[in-house]
From Swiss-Prot:
Superkingdom in the source lineage: Bacteria
CC per GO annotation: cytosolic large ribosomal subunit
This protein's name: Large ribosomal subunit protein uL16
Gene: rplP
Organism expressing this protein natively: Bifidobacterium longum subsp. infantis (strain ATCC 15697 / DSM 20088 / JCM 1222 / NCTC 11817 / S12)
GO biological process, one term: translation
Region spans: Disordered: 1-22
UniProt KW Ribonucleoprotein keyword: yes
Amino acid sequence: MLIPKRTKYRKQHRPVRSGMSKGGNEINFGDFGIQSLAPAYVTNRQIEAARIAMTRYIKRGGRVWITIFPDRPLTKHPLGARMGSGKGAPEFWIANVRPGRVMFEIGGVSEDVAKEALRRAIDKLPMKCRIIAREGGDI
């Protein structure tokens, strides 16, 4: 699981989800990638599930890069707790993903294999995404 080694504060405010992504909008490492089309909070478990789906499909060929990191804690009160009594305990870690952000990249495999591996990863993510290529844009 992806979590920060240490943070300055245990609890944080929820990040703003509006607006387009200001950086990380292009493919830097691989040949193909997944680009988000809607804002969402992606949890560390969702990132891990997408990574496993891709790596199991490509088997030993190719390489996968994860370009987002869950650096924000999301807090939650226990089920059945009454309102009030402060902010809840940190429940899980999220990455704030805005539209246009490239989240995963894949390289070293053919276009057909990359397309299917990325499609399987998209099924694990909570927002609408598209598959893009380094030189051609949308596939």
